[in-house]
Amino acid sequence: MVFAQTLVARRLEDVWSIVPEGAIGRHWWVLTQRVFSHWPVRGGTQWTPQRLTWVAAMMAWDEGQTLDARWEHAREVAGRLHPHWSLGTSYSGFAAALVRESPRVVAGIKAKFREVMLAMESRHQTRCGWRAFAVDGSRVEAPLTEANEEGLGCAGREKSGPQVFLTTLWHMGLGLPWDFHLGPGTDSERRHLEQMLDDLPQHSLIVADAGFVGYELCQRVLKARRSFLLRVGGNIRLLTDLGWEHEERDGLVHLWPLAHRDLPPLVLRLIILRRGNQEIYLLTNVFDPKQLSDEDASVLYEMRWGIEVFYRSYKQTLSRRRLLSRTPATCLAECSWTMLGLWLLSLLTVTGIVAKGLDPLSWSVALARNAVRRAMRVSLRGRGGRLLRDLEAAVKDRYVRRGPKAARDYPRKKREKPPGPPKIQSASPKEIQTAKRLREKISTAA
């Protein structure tokens, strides 16, 4: 029984300070303590960063319908796998410790997860020659308490309640999260992305739907020496024939809103994709078609759908559409650890899938969820599990469907109108003169 419990612990434990272990084979990882060792802990502390991490991650996987139920189950599993741990006996004490420790612990675990992802096989790191990252935001509902209304705010649709705004960077090659940022429901996904730019690898390509295009964000990405491929809609005005470039090339446009006429216009490349009767307009700062062809741009933009599926997995597959915490601080902590739990589950699963020579994008969230929940139940019965084998087999079905999987006309399904074309206009004589004076002013200052 001791061996069985240790086996389950090893398989649930592949996480916080993860290093490649070639001797084991199949490229699985073993745990070391280096992630937690640099965080000093006072003697007698029950909820250390390591124990908080274990319990919070397993709460993210648990199928309980209340926070108390998830916490009791996760605490029991952690106690079974680590009998020497002295764990607190109240959920309120755990929640207070989680809120207090989350900022430093979450940042440390994110960094470790990214190290592991960068160490994966190079052939899965890129798509169409780019280390591409999709970005998107989503709101998660929070309980309608007075504290949440005041601290989180109400945004989105009319009569909506308090929400947490979650913005995620998703690695399009590995199908894994790369980073995420949280804030009140009134936050901006553009501001969230700006705060995550510095943790992106050099020469990354950011792929996003309409809503991210703006002068300030594009300028910030350019200064960070990253590239982008952003859909643009009818709320954006683009200029041609401005004369800012010495050589006006086909496909070049200028993003130069009135509010930023004291700054240089952004020279960008416009890509127009045609799909049936629909046209999709994309802006990029990659001018060379050899580096990013129209065909590759089409493939990458279509792959951006993976982040939408990721949010569906978070909300529906894990049944985390609505947070359960009653204060803003605990809501943000709950959302953060649900994200880390899903990230960990995907990391464990994708590692096994890649070791078998399969595409990491083939992993099934539902099968991985079932496997880890079964392992948690098995650990309480004192029997060894088969978590690694189950996660390696957690891949999507490969058969070709003959009809839609979803109901024909789900009554509450959102059917948003796609963005219209941007307003593309030739620069007026006044705009050309303004640009000329600005260029002369910049040249004189230099």
Residue ranges and their predicted role:
Residues E115-S122:
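A short, well-structured juxtamembrane/interface segment
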Residues M1-H73, S86, L98-E101, G108-K112, ...:
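Single, function-defining residue in the core of a domain
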Residues E76-A95:
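Short, basic interhelical loop/turn and adjoining N-cap
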